[in-house]
A protein has these predicted regions:
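Conserved ABC ATPase signature
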Residues: 35-39, 43
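A short, proline-enriched helix->beta-strand linker immediately N-terminal to the Walker B motif
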Residues: 54-58
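Catalytic Walker B motif of ABC-type/P-loop ATPase nucleotide-binding domains
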Residues: 60-63
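Helix N-cap at the start of a conserved alpha-helix in ABC-type nucleotide-binding domains
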Residues: 71-73
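H-loop/switch region of ABC-family ATPase nucleotide-binding domains
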Residues: 95-96
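A short, surface-exposed alpha-helical micro-motif characterized by mixed small hydrophobic
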Residues: 101-103
Length: 144
């Protein structure tokens, strides 16, 4: 965990303690000494989340955190994201998983061609979409 030591000037033992705590929090405390190649895709994603948390960020950015995972591993990462949301962490989540977005968001922004097409509370956006494009997108994700 070089970043917190170098960037934040935190003492190594303190960083190691927080790293172990965050690895436990994301459910891979038993993998403290594992190399990335020894971890599954879901474990690698959760290790990345733990690394980010060690920097004590004000906000976390997730860019399609579950897109390359099989369904079982996907659920592991979703559980961690839901737990972080329940803690009140600020997160910006880019995803095509509308169920995840609805479950963890307090504000949703739907982009089309790089522009904001629609935004608001998840219930409003998902239950009563105003734009044809969002309605089309939601119907295609429900059918999939």
């Amino acid at each position: 965990m070089e970043a917190p030591v170098t960037v934040l000037k935190r003492p190594g033992p303190e960083v190691e303690t927080s790293a172990r705590r965050y690895l436990e929090q994301v459910g891979i405390g038993d993998k403290c000494d594992a190399y990335p190649a020894q971890l599954s895709g879901g474990q690698q994603q959760r290790a990345a989340i733990a690394r980010a948390l060690c920097m004590e960020p004000e906000a976390l950015l997730f860019d399609e955190p579950t897109s390359a995972l099989d369904p079982e591993l996907e659920q592991e990462v979703i559980r961690v994201i839901k737990d972080l949301a329940a803690e009140g962490r600020t997160m910006l989540l880019v995803t095509h998983d509308m169920k995840l977005a609805a479950d963890v968001s307090n504000h949703v922004i739907f982009l089309h061609r790089g522009l904001i097409e629609e935004q608001g509370a998840p219930k409003t956006v998902f239950d009563a979409p105003k734009s044809d494009r969002l309605r089309q997108f939601l119907s295609s994700t429900v059918a999939a």
